[in-house]
Design a protein with these regions (language model features):
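Short basic helix-loop element that most often maps to the first helix and adjoining turn
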Residues: 9-28, 53
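Short amphipathic recognition helices of helix-turn-helix/homeodomain-type DNA-binding modules
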Residues: 64-71
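Recognition helix of helix-turn-helix/homeodomain-like DNA-binding domains
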Residues: 30-45, 70
């Protein structure tokens, strides 16, 4: 699993834990809902800047989005 897929899984998990929709996360982070969806599907790689904006919107550390978890 590459880092893009790890971020996709963590982003979806953290967003659901905060009970946020993709649209709400997009609004909070200044991104489009389409782009948030693409990140969650691992269709695109997020830049470090975008990673920081998403982490801020979710009130987590950027590393939380990149941390590999064991199944």
């Amino acid at each position: 699993m590459d880092l893009k897929e790890v971020m996709a899984i963590n982003l979806r998990r953290l967003r659901h834990a905060k009970q946020m929709t993709q649209e709400e996360l997009a609004d909070s982070s200044g991104l489009s809902a389409r782009y948030v969806g693409a990140i969650e599907r691992a269709d695109v790689s997020a830049s470090v800047t975008v990673l920081g904006r998403i982490a801020d919107a979710l009130h987590v550390e950027p590393a939380d989005l990149l941390r590999k978890t064991t199944p």
